[in-house]
Structure formats: C-alpha cells, structure tokens
Regions:
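Short, low-complexity, Pro/Ser/Thr/Gly-rich segments in the mature regions of secreted, periplasmic
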Residues: 309-315
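Short acidic DE-rich linear segments
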Residues: 1, 315-316
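Short, aromatic/basic amphipathic alpha-helical patches
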Residues: 265-271, 289-302
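Surface-exposed receptor/substrate recognition regions of extracellular proteins
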Residues: 1-62, 277
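Consensus positions within tandem repeat domains that build extended binding/scaffold surfaces
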Residues: 64-67, 86-91, 108-113, 130-135, ...
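Short, surface-exposed acidic
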Residues: 20-28, 297-306
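Structural signature of tandem-repeat unit edges
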Residues: 47-62, 71-84, 94-106, 116-128, ...
Length: 316
C-alpha cells in the first residue's frame, strides 16, 4: 500500500474514533501531515505508520505537530517543499540520521527533541531557533542555521554542538543557549544584547567577543566555568550575577571609550578570579580612574588595567 493510502486509511480510522464526518482526501493528507487530537485534553498522536523507515514526499508543504512523533524506526526524511514544521514533529525519532527540509522557514518547539542519532541538522531558511528545538539530541555536533535572527529557551540544550555560527542572530530571547554544555565557541557578530540566562551553564564555553552587545542582562553568562576571556567593545551595562560562578574568568575587556559601563551589583563577579584578585578588567586608559571609583566597580579597583598597556592581551 502506498504511503498516501496508508495516511488516508489512518485518517479514516481517526475520524471514526473521534466521530468526525469530514472526509480527508489524499491531497489533504499530502499537504498537511499533522497530529490529530484524539481526546479533549489536547494530546495528539502521530498519524504515520510506526514501521516506516524512510519518508520522502516533494508535495508536502506543512509537516504538522506530532506528525512523526516517536517513530523509532525512521532513519531519513525528505520534504523539500515543506515551509513549516510543527511542534514535536520528529520528537523521539531516535534512529533519524538524515533530514532534508531546505525550504522550511518555521520549525516549532521541540520539533527534533530526542533525535539521539542525528549528527547534523541543516535549517538554511529558518529564522528562529524555537524552544528545546534539538533538546536531548545527544549525537548532534553540527547545526547550520545561517538565517536565524532570534531564539527561544534551551534551543540546543543536551546536544553535542561545540561550535555555533549564527551570523544574523540579533535579538535572542532568554535562556536560548542555557545548558548547552558542549558549546565551546560562538560566532554571533550582530548580537545586540545578552538576554537573561542566555548562556547560563554553558560550561564548556571558553572565549567570547560580542562587538555589538550593548547590555549584559541578569545571569546571562552565569556558570560558564570554562569562560576565561570576554570582550565587550560597546557594552553599556552589566546586570546582576552576569558572570557569577565563571570560575576561569581572568580577562574582561570593556572598550567603550566615551563613558563607563554601569555595574548593577558587585555580585556580577562572585566566584570569579576577578573577585578573588587574580583576574583583570581592561578599560581605556582615559577612563581608568573613573572606573576605580565608580559605584560597585570600586570593589574591584585593584583589578583594573589600561587596555593600552597590555596589547598582547587586548590587541591594543
């Protein structure tokens, strides 16, 4: 039986179970492979045969929520015309190794959650990394999403992604890279602020340079225990507990030359080498004395150094 016939038959079975009378045609099934509500509590179940191992359909434009949910035998999917992928669409597909969704612009929350065999995911048209997108994808080492401009919480938590390039990411939500414990380096040149909890507990992150970040919000880098070097060229403010528990942080560079960066609370550096007198904050020489006496910064007066005096560290 062809896959479309199977889908149609399953649609008929679900319709019989729910008491609905509207006919689901093959064309409709091909257009929207989606989750069907089976009871009043909003739970949905996959409508795809549990024995399927490969799926390819160039006609599909929408992959609905839960469409392939928990398909343990599914190894490859190709839906080259799909522009939208619903929540949990491939969640739990533990054998999935190949995904082809070149036109998808929207991929909803948890779409690839717990796809534990997936090593690479290409989302060339997606603009938002939605919540828990690849949560628990314990083999995933590469994510290609060059058009992403925003994100939501825990998008890559539980993956093995070490290097992440998001050249257009500008305004992420809070906690987007929280618990991304394998992440070592990031390239995000357009990022304009560090939202609350943005890199919270990204324990492998080593160095960061954010040329366009103007503010570092509450606990945005907290618990980044491998983080040793932070360069914030135009940053204007550092909120509470931003670097709390960054136990390797020995270099912070604040290059903004027209005014000092405000510090909301001294706890921004609690449990760091800077707080322990072993790390340093590099600022423009013209602002050095102002930083030493500024509110909250005065606590770390002995840790300030002039950028110009340490070109080997700061690049001058």
């Amino acid at each position: 039986m062809a896959i479309t016939d199977k889908l149609n038959a399953i649609g008929d079975a679900i319709r019989n179970k729910t008491g609905k009378t509207d006919k689901l045609t093959l064309d409709q099934m091909a257009t929207e492979i989606g989750g069907i509500t089976t009871d009043g509590d909003g739970l949905a179940r996959s409508i795809v045969n549990k024995t399927i191992t490969n799926y390819s359909d160039s006609e599909v434009t929408v992959v609905g929520g839960y469409a392939f949910f928990d398909q343990k035998k599914l190894t490859s999917v190709s839906v080259p015309s799909a522009t939208s992928i619903g929540s949990y669409a491939f969640s739990g597909c533990s054998a999935l190794t190949s995904v082809n969704v070149p036109k998808a612009t929207t991929v909803s929350d948890r779409a690839f959650q717990q796809c534990t065999s997936l090593t690479r995911l290409d989302l060339p048209k997606v603009t938002t990394l939605n919540g828990y997108l690849v949560y628990g994808c314990s083999s995933l080492v590469e994510l290609n999403a060059p058009e992403v401009t925003s994100g939501r919480g825990y998008a890559i938590a539980g993956s093995k992604i070490e290097h992440l390039s998001l050249p257009k990411l500008k305004t992420p939500g809070s906690s987007v890279f929280r618990d991304a414990t394998s992440l070592r380096t990031v390239y995000m040149p357009k990022l304009d602020r560090l939202e609350a909890y943005l890199f919270y507990n990204a324990t492998a992150l080593e160095t960061v340079t954010f040329p366009n970040v103007a503010s570092a919000n509450n606990q945005s880098m907290r618990g980044c225990t491998a983080l040793a070097y932070v360069d914030l060229p135009i940053n204007k403010s550092i909120s509470t507990q931003v670097f709390y528990g960054c136990s390797s942080l020995n270099t912070l560079i604040l290059r903004k030359s027209d005014d000092i960066c405000t510090l909301a609370n001294t706890n921004a550096f609690t449990s760091t080498p800077i707080a322990n007198g072993e790390g340093y904050i590099y600022v423009p020489e013209a602002l050095l004395e102002s930083y030493k006496t500024a509110t909250n910064w005065s606590t770390y007066a002995n840790q300030f150094r002039a950028i110009e005096d340490y070109p080997e560290i700061t690049g001058g």
